[in-house]
């Protein structure tokens, strides 16, 4: 079985860390495509890094090998890749990570920068955070397996999405998953709806 694994979540939630955990536990992640590492290797040029990441994804799909991608899910690129992978009979697996506030993501990004990591403008973080449920909802119908992890205090699997339903693991449900469930039930009433003009994104983790 060919597997396309997506490590999703807004900026600063710990996508690379979860990839590391999963890689230590499993041998089916295949080629791991980390746009930030690719960009760093290209001298920090994010445009070149993004293009190279897309090239590696497309090559992996063409070769029919397992691949793993870290993404904020913003923009239309991930959905296009998922649809292409499905046409090629890939099993689509999504591990989505969340935290309860944009401020928490921003704090973690600042901590990352202090350790030599890459920065993300605060306005971009907040915009993507406010639009996260819409971005997630767009790809859920195309995924064969979805697990949702809370990362307030280490990675804990809190829910899964199956047969069109969001199923929580126990009574200790994070606020962001409660909000996601409300959004799924009534998207038009989303209290965190994206302001006009913020519909198109350039990927950046």
Where are these regions (language model features)?
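Pre-Walker A (Motif I) flank of P-loop NTPase domains
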Residues: 1-4, 64-65
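P-loop (Walker A) phosphate-binding loop of NTP-binding proteins
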Residues: 10
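Hydrophobic anchor at the beta1->P-loop junction of P-loop NTPases
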Residues: 7
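Conserved glycine(s) of the Walker
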Residues: 14
């Amino acid at each position: 079985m060919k597997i396309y694994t997506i490590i999703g979540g807004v900026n600063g939630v710990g996508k690379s860390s979860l990839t590391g955990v999963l890689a230590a536990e499993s041998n089916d992640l295949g080629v791991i495509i980390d746009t930030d590492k690719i960009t760093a290797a290209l001298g920090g040029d994010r445009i070149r890094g993004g293009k190279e990441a897309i090239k590696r994804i497309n090559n992996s799909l063409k070769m029919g090998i397992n691949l793993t991608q870290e993404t904020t899910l913003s923009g239309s690129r991930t959905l296009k890749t998922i649809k292409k992978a499905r046409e090629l009979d890939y099993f689509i697996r999504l591990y989505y990570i969340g935290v309860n506030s944009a401020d928490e993501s921003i704090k973690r990004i600042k901590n990352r920068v202090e350790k030599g990591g890459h920065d993300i403008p605060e306005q971009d973080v907040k915009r993507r955070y406010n639009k996260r449920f819409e971005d997630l909802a767009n790809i859920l119908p195309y995924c064969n397996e979805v697990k949702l992890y809370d990362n307030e205090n280490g990675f804990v699997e809190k829910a899964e999405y199956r047969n069109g339903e969001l199923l929580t693991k126990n009574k200790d449900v994070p606020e962001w998953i409660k909000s996601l469930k409300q959004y799924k039930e009534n998207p038009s009433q989303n209290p965190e709806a994206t302001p006009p003009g913020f519909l198109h994104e350039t990927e950046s983790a």
